[in-house]
Amino acid sequence: MKDILFMTVDLGTSFIKAGVYDTEGNCIISASEPVNDERPRPGMFIQRGEDLFGSVLRCIKKGTDALGDRAKNVEAMAFTGQMAGFMAVDKDWNDVTTWSCSIDTRYTPFADRQMKEYATDFLEISGTNAPQMCSKLEWFCHDFPEESKRIAKCVMISGYVLGKLGQIPIEEACIDGSLIAWSGYADIRKAEW
C-alpha cells in the first residue's frame, strides 16, 4: 500500500506550526517556528511578509527533515491560520504593507467610520460586521500614499504564502472562501471577491 501523507501548516500570530498526517488521520510529525513581530508603540503590531514567509519555509523544512525519506510521500499541503488581517503586495509578491492583523489598531478610525456609514451593507453583502481588509487598505492608502501606489493585490496571509510558494502570477492571487467575509470586499451570495 502506498504511503500517502498530507501536510498542514497553521499560519499563526506567534508561531507557524506544521503537521504531517497519514490517510487515517494520525499525526506523523509536528514542527513549529516562531514568528517575529515588532511592537514599537501601543496599538502598533508589525509582521513583515518576508519574515513570515521565512518562518513558514523553516517550519516546513523542519517537518520534511523529520520525515526523512518519507517526505517524498507528501501528496498535498493545506494552509490555515490568521483570518482578521490584511496584506498588500506588489506585482512580484513583495510585501508592501506588512501583515496587519487585528492587534495592529492603527486602522480603527477608518473601520469605525466605515461601520457607521456601511454597517448594513457589510452585513448584508459581505456577511461581516468586522470588515478588516477594506478598512486597513483605506488606512494604509491614507497614511502611506506613496507606498500604496505599489499595491497590485490585497491578500490574506495564506494567499501570500500560496502565491510566493507557487510563484503564481499576481493576477491569480486567491482567497480561501472561508476567509472572504473578513475582507469587506466580498459578495458572499455571488461568491465574488
Language model features: what each stretch is:
Residues L11-T13, D121-W193:
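Gly/Ser/Thr-rich active-site cleft segment
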Residues K2-D3, S30, P34, Y118-A119, ...:
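A generic structural signal for ordered alpha-helices
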